[in-house]
Amino acid sequence: MNGMAPPLFEPKERVLQLGETFEKQPRCAFHTVRYDFKPASIDTACEGDLEVGKGEQVTITLPNIEGSTPPVTVFKGSKKPYLKECILIINHDTGECRLEKLSSNITVKKIRAEGSSKVQSRIEQQQQQIRNSSKTPNNIKNSPPKDKMFPSSPMDDIERELKAEASIMDQLSSSDSSSDSKSSSSSSSSSENSSSDSEDEEARPSLPMSMPYLQPQPTLSAIPHQAVPDKDASHNRSQENSGHMMNTLRSDLQLSESGSDSDD
């Protein structure tokens, strides 16, 4: 026996006490729980939760070790009452032995769905808060952009200003081109008028200004078209008369010169 743990139940006489469950109005009850499978991820240092619903349905929620997925393990089943079963409880520190009646036997199976226990509800609340805190920036990031919600960028403002300036410059250039075309047309018309005036002046016959004996000619508007040959004829006659006078003067000069020579 050296090096081995002492036996839990030594062969000696003990005092057996009856527990509170043997009273007429028991203040506590004892149950047995039978699992079909108990995972190693269950944290035995933490407390679990047991719920009894309608129809003797039982839900047991046990927390898993921190970092496990999922965070809890859920069992569901039913309970059946015991008739004459008892449980012996031994306190090895004090050596006390106590006998208690069993109230019911609970048989449960592990399920994948999450239970509705208080522990699970608290865990769900914490997870929901974490999801909400992480979902808020994601919603803002992934929300579709709207033209009315977000202000335009500085590049868009500059582009609009450049387009407005370009349209103004186009309008000014079009107005300048129209004014240039009008001025060029007016200058061309004035040049045409001046050229036509010069042609009219060239077409008009030149009248001798050194003839005082000629009568002034009537205006062109008063002269009929048939009078144009008569004007030319009178002009020719005036030239002949002037030539005759010049001949007479030359002959007079010759006679005067010859007379002066004879006197000498």
From Swiss-Prot:
Region entry Disordered, spans: 114-154, 169-264
**Main localization of the protein?**
nucleus
**GO MF terms, alphabetically ordered:** transcription elongation factor activity
The GO annotation for biological process reads: positive regulation of DNA-templated transcription; transcription elongation by RNA polymerase II
Q: Which domain of life is it from?
A: Eukaryota
Quote the biased-composition stretches of kind Low complexity, using this chain's numbering: 173-196
Spell out the subcellular localization from the entry.
Nucleus speckle
Q: Which InterPro entries match?
A: EAF_fam, Tscrpt_elong_fac_Eaf_N
Which pairs of Cys residues are joined through disulfide bonds in the record? none
Q: Indicate, by first and last residue, each region the UniProt record lists as having compositional bias (Basic and acidic residues).
A: 228-238
Protein task = May act as a transcriptional transactivator.
**Family the entry assigns:** Belongs to the EAF family.
Under which name does UniProt file this protein?
ELL-associated factor 2
Species for this entry? Gallus gallus
Organism classification: Eukaryota, Metazoa, Chordata, Craniata, Vertebrata
- Gene name per UniProt: EAF2
